[in-house]
């Protein structure tokens, strides 16, 4: 793949994530995350770390607010490794995600999601 087609494929992977979050569709999320993916980040002062199943469980038991958005802020590719910076709104406040991706065969997979979120004031 060329850099342009790799970037397009990475954006498609992030679209699977975004669509899965918007519609609480775990199958779509599973099209974004490698089966060994991990999560680690902050919501306020609380540190959360878990295997990817933790996100799937959360999505199955929670609803995402109607105003949820997911915007790619940037992508950097180095061979078969990439980093994508993404902003999510109306999930737990304003969240900046750093997705780390690996190209496995011809497919890009998110292998880690690292984030920092300031919680929404209730």
Tell me what each language-model feature is.
Residues 33, 88-90, 114-115:
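Short beta-strand segments enriched in hydrophobic/aromatic residues
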Residues 20, 66-69, 74-78, 109-110, ...:
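Low-complexity, flexible helical/coil segments
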Residues 1-27, 31-35, 47-48, 122:
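Short, low-complexity N-terminal intrinsically disordered segments enriched in polar/charged residues
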Residues 5-9, 38-96:
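Surface-exposed, charged secondary-structure patches
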């Amino acid at each position: 793949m060329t850099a342009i087609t790799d970037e397009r494929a990475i954006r498609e992977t992030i679209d699977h994530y975004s669509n899965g979050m918007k519609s609480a569709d775990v199958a779509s999320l599973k099209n974004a995350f490698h089966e060994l993916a991990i999560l680690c980040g902050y919501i306020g002062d609380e540190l959360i770390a878990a295997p990817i199943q933790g996100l799937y469980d959360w999505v199955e038991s929670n609803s995402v607010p109607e105003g949820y958005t997911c915007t790619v802020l940037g992508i950097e590719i180095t061979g078969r490794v990439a980093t994508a910076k993404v902003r999510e709104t109306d999930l737990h406040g304003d969240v900046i995600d750093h997705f780390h991706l690996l190209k496995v065969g011809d497919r890009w997979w998110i292998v880690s999601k690292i984030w920092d979120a300031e919680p929404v004031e209730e």
